[in-house]
Amino acid sequence: MLQTVVAAFRAAGVDEIVVVTGALHEPITALVGDAAQAVFNPEYASGEMLSSIQRGLRHLLSEKSEAEGVLIGLGDQPQVQARSVEAVCAAFRQSGARLVVPSYQKRRGHPWLAAYPLWELLLALGPSQTPRDFLNAHADQIHYVDVDTPSILADLDTPEDYLKSRP
C-alpha cells in the first residue's frame, strides 16, 4: 500500500519524500528503500496525525531542506493518483497560494500542500489540535484544485478496506 503512494508521488515529480513511521519503523524503512526517507515518530502511539506531520516538518528543517512547500499525504491511500499530486503541485507553482488542497465534489482531501512560511504555524499546533483545525483556521488562504477522482478522499484503515477497494 505505502509503496503505491510513494510511487505516485515520485511519478508526479516529487523529489524529496519523507515517510513518518511508528511501531513498524524497521519494516517500513526496508519497504520504501531508496524511494523515500523513513523518519521515526516517537509519539506514534498517540495515533494523532498531527504528531507525524510535525515530526516530518522538524526533520525537513533539521536537514535544511530547500523545499518551498510540503505535501501532506496519507500512507494508507494507495489509490491516490500521480495526476492528483501533479495538479496540487502545479496549482502551488502557478497560484502563489500558501495552501493548496485537492477537492472532489466540494470535499477536500489529500495530499494537500503547505508553503514553507506555514510550517512554523503547523509546528505550533498543540496536541489537542488537528490538521483539520489548521485548514479551517486558514480557510481564507486555501486554493482548491478540483480533481476528477475520489481517490483523494479515501484512506484504507484495515486490510478489509484494502481488499474492498481492489478492482
Positions of the model-derived regions?
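Conserved alpha/beta core of the MobA/IspD/sugar-nucleotide pyrophosphorylase nucleotidyltransferase superfamily
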Residues: L123-P167
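Nucleotide and nucleotide-moiety/phosphate-recognizing core
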Residues: M1-R108, L121, D140-V147
